[in-house]
Amino acid sequence: MGLDASLAILGWTRMVILVVCFAGAAHLDNKQRKVHNSYWKVWVKSAVLLWVLEIAIRSDDWITYCTMAAVLAYGSTALIGTPTIADLKKGSWVDWAVVVWYGIGMYGIYWGVVEYIPLNDVTAVLSYPTNSNEYMWLQTLMVIPIMFFIKMAWKLRLIHGGADAKALLFVAVLIPSWVTFVPVNGDTFVPPVFALLVWGGLGFFLLPLSLILHNIADNNVKSFDDITMIWHATRMPLDEITDNFVWLLDEVVISPDGEPTIVSSLQPPKKSPTREELMIKIEELRLMDVEDAWVTKKYPLLSYIFPGTILMIFFGDPIWWILYFAGLA
């Protein structure tokens, strides 16, 4: 079997794993609004194995293997946390293993810089042949900034759910590049994990329009203030709020003249209230003689990303398509 055939089998295996894994994750996230770390720990094993096989097929270079260790150590902190001095003193073998992996990874990165980056002409890295050890090492190294971007987006709440961030980190390991997979249609421009995120994000563009039509049909537009709410929220009976995955946007506040009034927030709270705190807010609204309130649903991003896996298989990178229709690709 030739190299191209081996990579093709590897690529399609990755895509099958991606679809099956995300189908299960989307189901769990939709039902529970939570995907336990144990789920990702099971699936990431297959992703790591396939990555090792890719390196073995393309370069079998010890520097690249070591650099991959740095990527895995950095990504593992999303599942097991960052090792601390206190944990190491307690003799936690998991934390010590991560530290060892970091050491191996730093060793690989150091020798990669020494061997593969000409200091007198750094721009030479842009012209490495795709089948060279240098190119494979550089592709492996570039997964680290991709993971950093995902983690920062998570911390800054650009990616709201932990399961969503861990899913994207999983994709970064499962499909670090497009080398092993050629989409049925279209071409590629950005890394696979970002292409998948864009495909999933397209579903959110249709969400405001859907909510506007839903609120108009339910006659939820009764004042000018309601117009500011209909594109991202819906009204729900107070009795149903605690049994649904929603954020309550209405709140009773005391106005400057000492009178209680209902204020609708345009954003969900930064920290989800406890059930007791939510019940107090609902009771305050009942005392204002209201029967329903504005809420925004906790839409699971994974439910939107999952269809994106199919779109990515058949249409590749959405950014490339945008550039194509703009006449730039």
Region annotations inferred by a language model:
Residues 1-329:
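A membrane-topology feature that recognizes alpha-helical transmembrane segments
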